[in-house]
A protein has these predicted regions:
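An interfacial alpha-helical scaffold signature
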Residues: 1-198
Length: 198
């Protein structure tokens, strides 16, 4: 098996001086390909290993590649945009399987977000809406994550705190974060409420 680029060309094996030196010192073994999320010298969990290149008995890296079935692509590899703030970063990590859900929930509770609102003249309560079969209260982590148009003609956005979401969102409803982006995250209102309790 040889990994492919986005346009289906074979990906060449690593050819850096460090990779060649590792291969020279470790003939007959494997050279791990690591997700770029992890820096040099960091401890890498199993899910951060893309796979491994075979090193032959002469200490040369071959074109043979063994894929790691447990690999999880990081936000960068998935093409997520650069996080606009700490909550955005936490959401991206959770969606990619790199972050703890509980930490993102706690951060949402302590953050101010933008909430989709109904047309002018409607009450200012949290609005439960449906888009593409997904129902919930739609919130956005920052101005950078807002859609170009309101979710409903005449609608807009307003700021809300995570604690307001926890206290006002009805049971059985999801808080849907950044629905228009690649890192979409859903949190049940009951879970947010439970996390807000002292």
């Amino acid at each position: 098996l040889v990994p492919l680029t986005d346009d289906d060309r074979p990906l060449p094996p690593p050819d850096s001086p460090a990779a060649r030196e590792f291969a020279r010192r470790n003939p007959g073994s494997w050279l791990h390909e690591i997700d770029p999320f992890f820096g040099s010298g960091e401890d890498v969990p199993p899910y951060g290993i893309v796979g491994a290149w075979r090193i032959d008995e002469a200490g040369e890296i071959t074109g043979r590649f063994r894929k790691n079935p447990g690999y999880r692509p990081s936000p960068r590899v998935l093409g997520f945009p650069e996080p606009a703030d700490a909550l955005d970063a936490a959401v991206q990590l959770v969606v990619a399987g790199y972050g703890a859900d509980d930490q993102a929930v706690a951060l949402l509770l302590s953050s101010e977000v933008l909430v989709a609102t109904q047309p002018e003249g409607a009450d200012d309560s949290l609005w439960v809406h449906e888009i593409d079969g997904i129902e919930g209260i739609f919130v956005f982590t920052s101005q950078e994550r807002l859609p170009s148009e309101p979710l409903l003609e005449g609608g807009s956005w307003r700021t809300a705190t995570g604690s307001e979401l926890a206290s006002s969102a009805p049971d059985g409803v999801d808080i849907v974060v950044n629905i228009n982006g690649p890192a979409r995250w859903k949190v049940p209102a009951q879970r947010l409420r439970a996390a807000a309790r002292p």
